[in-house]
Amino acid sequence: MALKSLVLLSLLVLVLLLVRVQPSLGKETAAAKFERQHMDSSTSAASSSNYCNQMMKSRNLTKDRCKPVNTFVHESLADVQAVCSQKNVACKNGQTNCYQSYSTMSITDCRETGSSKYPNCAYKTTQANKHIIVACEGNPYVPVHFDASV
């Protein structure tokens, strides 16, 4: 009888732990969100004027509204993560966890056009080589927010 009670108690504890942990299992981490929204290592540069229209849609950045501005970085994830140990600068919001790349990086800026209207979001594609500024958090310290390019 005691063994049966112990087994039932163990199962109850396991179920309660699963219920508590389960909601976070499907949640995208800030680092994964940064990668989805800003990383495009497979492309060395914007390949066409339609690049932003395609990428913004495929990365779910036009799901509920037209995101006004977004930047894609065409460098390796390791190179972008390395920025978190480079030049410390103030973020636009005043936080102190932003870092500027020592070297320029290949980026594509996507800006919503005046004729854009949800759900038919339209973007202007601009290719550039600039220093990037990212906010970093966590352990390991990784990019979680694209702050600017200069």
UniProtKB/Swiss-Prot annotation:
The organism's place on the tree of life at top rank: Eukaryota
Location of the active site: H38 (proton acceptor), H145 (proton donor)
Residues bearing glycans: K27, K33, N60, K63, K67
Amino-acid positions noted as binding substrate in the UniProt annotation, renumbered to this chain: K33, R36, K67, P68, V69, N70, T71, K92, R111
Tissue-specificity statement: Pancreas.
Native source organism of the sequence: Bos taurus (Bovine)
Cited InterPro entries: RNaseA, RNaseA-like_dom_sf, RNaseA_AS, RNaseA_domain
Signal peptide: 1-26
Cellular location(s): Secreted
Task of the protein: Endonuclease that catalyzes the cleavage of RNA on the 3' side of pyrimidine nucleotides. Acts on single-stranded and double-stranded RNA.
UniProt name for this protein: Ribonuclease pancreatic
Gene Ontology MF term list: lyase activity; nucleic acid binding; ribonuclease A activity; RNA nuclease activity
A Gene Ontology biological process term: defense response to Gram-positive bacterium
One GO CC term, this protein: extracellular region
Pfam families noted in UniProt: RnaseA
Catalytic activity: an [RNA] containing cytidine + H2O = an [RNA]-3'-cytidine-3'-phosphate + a 5'-hydroxy-ribonucleotide-3'-[RNA]; an [RNA] containing uridine + H2O = an [RNA]-3'-uridine-3'-phosphate + a 5'-hydroxy-ribonucleotide-3'-[RNA]
Record note on quaternary structure: Interacts with and forms tight 1:1 complexes with RNH1. Dimerization of two such complexes may occur. Interaction with RNH1 inhibits this protein. Monomer.
Disulfide bridge partners, by residue number: C52-C110, C66-C121, C84-C136, C91-C98
Entry keywords, A to Z: Disulfide bond, Endonuclease, Glycation, Glycoprotein, Hydrolase, Lyase, Nuclease, Secreted, Signal
Family classification: Belongs to the pancreatic ribonuclease family.
